[in-house]
Amino acid sequence: MFVAASTRCFSNLPLDAALQRLVDLEYTAVEIALDESGGHLKPSQVAQHLEKAVQICRRTQRLTPVAYSVEIQADSEAQYYAQFDACCRLAKATKVNTIAVRSEELGTPFNAEIERLQELVRLAAKEGVVVGLVTESGRMTQDPATAAVFCKNVKGLALTLDPSHYICGPHQGAPFEQVMEHVCHVRLRDSTKDCLQVRVGQGDVEYGRLLGQLAKQHYTRALTADIQPLPDLDQASELRKIRLLLESLL
């Protein structure tokens, strides 16, 4: 395992500046956000200008890209899958093998979500990329049992584990071991049952226990700091603290 950080940690800065801040904080690996609603690079831009997107994502200032976080807002199903396909080709061109995607919102028919995930996995597999479905409150993966069922029903699907949503969400800190065997990517911040993000060291995330559970499943990939910019929060200090904390446990 190794420590990384998401460009979402500096979503208020241009991509070049966000990457430089992460370098200054001594990170060596990065998850890059491709988000239509405000990421550093939009999936529609990737689809329209793939080669330009590849060039941008290769200029990472000594940071190694380890995952893309993809959030698409398309007018049609065909456009949605075309943009996702372009993101997969970007991943292959930049030697990234993980794409994190969100599950659909609660209330979506289970079979419809299975069909969507099957198509995403099919497109990703063509480029040698793994789809990691994010565990998230308010969405179909908010229940760890359901998240595990998705992986069992969609061959090749994995999970992006965000344990904060199992601590703060409806799960309220109950065990979630059943998802561990399916994890391909991890996002971390400190959280309590009442607040998704608190200062590092003031939350309920048991980092040592979590890393032990991942190690039992032979997980060797990124532990990605994903701390959102907030008013009155020293972002640099928080990112430095979580990096040092995670590195001390490895």
Q: Where are the model-predicted features located?
A:
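Glycine-rich, proline-tolerant flexible connector loops at the mouths of alpha/beta enzymes
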Residues: 31-55, 107
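Histidine-acidic metal/acid-base catalytic patches
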Residues: 1-4, 11-28, 54-61, 95, ...
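Conserved phosphate-coordination/catalytic loops
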Residues: 9, 13, 44-48, 78-81, ...
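A general secondary-structure boundary signal
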Residues: 26, 33, 80, 128-129, ...
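Charge-dense, low-complexity intrinsically disordered segments
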Residues: 40, 44, 78, 107, ...
